[in-house]
C-alpha cells in the first residue's frame, strides 16, 4: 500500500505575489554588504516562493544614503566611469565627490550591479527608493525596518 508521490515544482504567478515594504538605514553600513542584501530582497530570494523569471521581490526604501561607509581606502580611490557617447566624452567621478553631490547614485550603482541586466532587472530596480536624508515619503506603506549585518 505505497502511495506514489508527486512533487510539482511551484512557479509563482505575478498576481499572487504579496509585496512588503522594507526600510534600511544606511548609516555606517558597508556599501557592498548592504547592496547585496538589498538585491536579494528586491529579487525575492528571501521568499520560499522565489521563481527566477518572475518578479517576486519586495520594495526597499534606503535612508541616510550620504552616511554609507566604504571599507578600506575606497572612499579616496574608488572611481565611477561614464561616457557621453561623444568623442573624448569619458568622465571619472570619485566616490567622495559623488557622496557629496548625489549620495543616492552610489547605492543605486552598487545595487544595479548585483541585479540581472535585462527587462526583469529594470523592473526590480524600480522598486528601490533611495533618499539622502532620514525622511522619506513612503510612510503610508508602513515599511518594516530591515536589519543588515
UniProtKB/Swiss-Prot annotation:
Its biological purpose: This protein is one of the early assembly proteins of the 50S ribosomal subunit, although it is not seen to bind rRNA by itself. It is important during the early stages of 50S assembly.
Entries under PANTHER family matching the protein: LARGE RIBOSOMAL SUBUNIT PROTEIN UL13M, RIBOSOMAL PROTEIN L13
Keyword tRNA-binding: no
Pfam family of the protein (one): Ribosomal_L13
InterPro entries cross-referenced by the UniProt entry: Ribosomal_uL13 (IPR005822), Ribosomal_uL13_bac-type (IPR005823), Ribosomal_uL13_sf (IPR036899)
Any one GO CC term of the record: cytosolic large ribosomal subunit
Keywords: Ribonucleoprotein, Ribosomal protein
NCBIfam families in UniProt: rplM_bact
GO MF entries: mRNA binding; structural constituent of ribosome
Disulphide bridges: none
Gene Ontology biological process terms, A to Z: negative regulation of translation; translation
HAMAP family in alphabetical order: Ribosomal_uL13
Similarity comment text for this entry: Belongs to the universal ribosomal protein uL13 family.
Ribonucleoprotein recorded as keyword: yes
Name the UniProt record assigns to this protein: Large ribosomal subunit protein uL13
N-terminal signal peptide: none
Subunit architecture: Part of the 50S ribosomal subunit.
Amino acid at each position: 500500500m505505497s502511495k506514489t508521490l508527486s512533487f510539482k515544482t511551484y512557479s509563482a504567478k505575478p498576481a499572487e505575489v504579496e509585496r512588503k515594504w522594507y526600510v534600511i538605514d544606511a548609516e555606517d553600513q558597508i556599501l557592498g554588504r548592504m547592496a547585496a542584501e538589498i538585491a536579494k530582497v528586491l529579487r525575492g530570494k528571501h521568499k520560499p516562493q522565489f521563481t527566477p523569471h518572475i518578479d517576486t521581490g519586495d520594495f526597499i526604501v534606503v535612508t541616510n544614503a550620504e552616511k554609507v561607509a566604504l571599507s578600506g581606502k575606497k572612499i579616496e580611490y574608488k572611481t565611477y566611469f561614464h561616457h557621453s557617447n561623444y568623442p573624448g566624452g569619458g568622465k571619472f567621478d570619485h566616490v567622495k565627490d559623488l557622496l557629496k553631490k548625489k549620495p543616492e547614485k552610489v547605492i543605486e550603482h552598487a545595487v544595479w550591479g548585483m541585479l540581472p541586466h535585462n527587462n526583469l532587472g529594470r523592473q526590480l530596480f524600480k522598486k528601490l527608493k533611495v533618499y539622502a536624508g532620514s525622511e522619506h515619503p513612503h510612510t503610508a506603506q508602513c515599511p518594516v525596518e530591515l536589519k543588515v549585518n
